[in-house]
Amino acid sequence: MSQDRLPQMVISIMLLANFDVSERCNIRPRSFDLIAKKGDNLVIIKVASHIDSVSADITWDLNLIARYLEATPLIVGERARDTDLERGVVYIRYGLFALNPETLYDYFVEGLSPMVYASPGGLYVRIKGDLLREVRERFRMSLGDLASHLGVSRRTISKYESGMGTTLDVAIKLEEIFNAPLVETIELLGYRTPEPEKHLESTPGDVLADLERMGMEIHAMRQAPFQALALFDRHTILTAYGTSQKIVKRASLIGNISQITKTFAMCVVTDYKKQKKIGKTLLIGEEHLHTLEDGSELIDMINE
């Protein structure tokens, strides 16, 4: 089966949902495959047939890029361990949402939010705790009464009312008892990843150190097509660096991604002494970069 089938399916779904979609990232290693934008919603997507192949380094990049671009990170795949991903179910990989293409289609094209999430032990849903308490009291039913109906403890009912997840069977029984929609939907676009742990990343060569000298906040990537996010005065610069042979393959892709994400793109070339633009991407020699005094000079050059 073609390796392009799944990525092309994901691209088609996002286009069908009227998203602008970036060029597909074909550079290895890569922590994401495409970025899509519609209005204020920005989605960064990693496509992997088997979601267990998505490493901690990949999710580190996805988390970091999503946080600083105010995007939603998603993993789209077909299998986990030895089973197919189920339609309408959200899985978790290193804290990020993972789902199959059908669930992606249902959410972005049909507007149907998933309700079920996979966790060790099976499939679960999250209960609307405040609503459960409200309808239970309206029915004049005590914690003990409801616990007896469900065959669980009073403490468990109290936890449901605090938002604890439960099995599908219990959720169905609750909705039948009270005739109320008690299950929370999972809003993929509203999801924000946890604050990443602070790690001192190594900065190969002098390029990132030079950018820091110019007053920029630097976040090094591990497997992204750009090696760093450089932040300066409300501007974000997708930054790659290396020899001209390596950079030429990245310049166009990074420029395309910057257009979708409304950011800047820059490639620092270690064996080049001048500067020029390839599309929206600034190519600047490492020696030339070293002569700049602060980030505003670099922003002006990118804007030229």
Curated annotation (Swiss-Prot):
The segment(s) forming the HTH cro/C1-type domain are 132-189
Against PROSITE patterns, the record matches this protein to:
HTH_CROC1
Kindly indicate whether the keyword Secreted belongs to this entry: no
User: Matching SMART domains, A to Z?
Assistant: HTH_XRE
DNA-binding region location: 143-162
Q: Give one Pfam hit by family name.
A: HTH_3
Q: Which GO terms describe its molecular function?
A: DNA binding; DNA-binding transcription factor activity
Which Gene3D superfamilies does the record associate with it? lambda repressor-like DNA-binding domains
Q: Which UniProt keywords apply?
A: DNA-binding, Transcription, Transcription regulation
Family matches, as InterPro entries: Arc_TR_HTH (IPR020886), Cro/C1-type_HTH (IPR001387), Lambda_DNA-bd_dom_sf (IPR010982)
Here the disulfide bonds are none
Coiled coil segments of this chain: none
Q: Which HAMAP family match?
A: HTH_type_cro_C1 (MF_00584)
Protein known as: Putative HTH-type transcriptional regulatory protein Memar_2347
Q: What is the lineage of its organism?
A: Archaea, Methanobacteriati, Methanobacteriota, Stenosarchaea group, Methanomicrobia
